[in-house]
Amino acid sequence: VSRGLGDVYKRQIAVSGGNTPALMFDLWANEYMEITPWDRMRIYWVDERCVPPDDSDSNYGMMRNLLLGLTPILYENVFRIRGEAKPAKEAVRYSELVRQQVPLKRGWPEFDIVLLGAGDDGHTSSIFPGQEDLLTSNSIYVVSAHPRNGQKRIAMTGYPIQNARYVIFLITGKNKVDVVEEICHSGDTGPAAYIAHHAQNVELFVDKAAAAYIDDSNKKMN
């Protein structure tokens, strides 16, 4: 993240929710608080569950509690998705906000950093398997729905994610081994793999459990 910030005065960073980003936010607050240039960061969200900010499911609420509430960042530089609003209207509002504030490149917003997680089903940015058409939407944000519980979400689509200067995947847990394999090798088989194979600059950070496939591949090669 520090490398992605560089020397430019304001950097545009889009963050995700989920268990793995929560681990990063906690580490960030406890280990890197003092060296982070908070005055040079603008924070946006990749996706949000359609719930109020104080709901335990809120991605914004999680980051506020684990990190933002502990930092000196000005809230004028924090741009949350309004999960309590009507989903379709909020997707349009937030798309327009991002289009106006984030520099454009090739007609799409160019975030400096997009931080992504991945589910054990291969979803990312609240775009789930079977919803791959949302990846190629001409909108910046769209409404999606969880395939099991039907919970509405607002999700960044494929083109603005792929257009970011850095796309960083954070993946942990042995239940994500197959997802790591998809990302490393199989191309367009799921949303996370699709992004990994189409983004201009991708970095993958995994823990030992999620990296089991990579370890096995290296052993076979050796």
Task: Give the ranges of each region predicted by the language model.
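Single conserved hydrophobic/aromatic residue that forms the stacking wall/gate
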Residues: 1-9
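Glycine-rich beta-strand-to-loop/alpha-helix junction loops that act as flexible
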Residues: 15-20, 116-120, 172
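A glycine- and small-aliphatic-rich helix-loop capping segment at beta-alpha/alpha-beta transitions
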Residues: 26-37, 61, 65, 129-138
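Short, conserved loop/helix-junction motifs that constitute active-site signature segments
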Residues: 34-42, 72-73, 133-135, 159-164, ...
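Ligand-binding beta-strand-loop-alpha-helix segment within the catalytic cores
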Residues: 36-112
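A short secondary-structure junction signal
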Residues: 91-92, 125-130, 179-183, 216
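Class I SAM-dependent methyltransferase SAM-binding "motif I" and its flanking Rossmann-like core
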Residues: 116-159
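ATP/nucleoside-binding phosphotransfer catalytic cores, i.e., glycine-rich phosphate-binding loops
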Residues: 159, 165-222
